């Protein structure tokens, strides 16, 4: 009986001294400002040579180690002149979301591949100056519609890569953003 109690005593003391003393108060997450602001240079340059005028900027900040929040905002103006249609649309849009860094460069944590999602909204004005309709006897006629204000909402996935240009504060960011239209006003 004493042998059994002696073993229980030693094992109990062994478990007692083997425990790590952990601080019961967890440190709070402290946000450190790390805002990155970007401009869509490609579409802004193409706007000089086409009917579509698209100007877009974005801001992103690291929320946690691999997770970042992103906000995109811009202005889009487009003219459609095909198949007898004469239409134009112009307005603003905004997208809010986040992304996860899938792989990062060891030397620069901002370089790497990422994936994420966004919710988007657009508020625009559209006008149809000419809409082709088939008249009696096959004659061409055109219908004009008054301008109207519209809004659209969508869900967007994003996957891309970002690389720093040399040792500067500039980055090249290439991404694909497929969209799913959730709702549009009529």
Name these PLM-found stretches:
Residues 35-37, 53-57, 92-96, 113-115, ...:
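Hydrophobic, lipid-facing positions within transmembrane beta-strands of outer-membrane proteins
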Residues 35-43, 61, 71-75, 115-123, ...:
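Transmembrane beta-barrel strands of outer-membrane/channel proteins
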Residues 61, 100-102, 161-165:
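Residue-level signature of outer-membrane beta-barrel architecture
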Residues 1-28:
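Cleavable N-terminal export/targeting peptides
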Residues 20-33, 66, 103-112, 165-172:
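Short loop/turn motifs that connect adjacent beta-strands in outer-membrane beta-barrel proteins
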Residues 19-62, 72:
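Short glycine/proline- and aromatic-enriched beta-strand/turn motifs that initiate or cap beta-hairpins
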């Amino acid at each position: 009986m004493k042998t059994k109690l002696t073993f229980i005593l030693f094992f109990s003391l062994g478990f007692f001294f083997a425990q790590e003393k952990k601080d019961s108060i967890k440190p709070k997450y402290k946000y450190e400002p790390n805002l990155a602001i970007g401009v869509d240079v490609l579409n802004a340059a193409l706007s000089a040579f086409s009917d579509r005028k698209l100007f877009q900027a974005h801001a992103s900040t690291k929320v946690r180690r691999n997770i970042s929040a992103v906000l995109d905002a811009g202005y889009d103006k487009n003219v459609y002149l095909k198949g007898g249609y004469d239409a134009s649309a112009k307005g603003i849009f905004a997208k809010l979301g986040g992304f996860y860094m899938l792989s990062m460069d060891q030397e620069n944590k901002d370089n790497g591949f990422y994936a994420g999602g966004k919710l988007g909204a657009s508020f625009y004005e559209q006008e149809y100056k000419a809409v082709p309709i088939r008249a009696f006897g096959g004659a061409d006629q055109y219908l004009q519609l008054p301008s109207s204000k519209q809004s659209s909402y969508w869900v967007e996935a994003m996957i891309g890569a970002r690389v720093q240009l040399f040792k500067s504060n500039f980055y090249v960011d290439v991404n694909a953003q497929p969209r799913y239209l959730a709702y549009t006003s009529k």
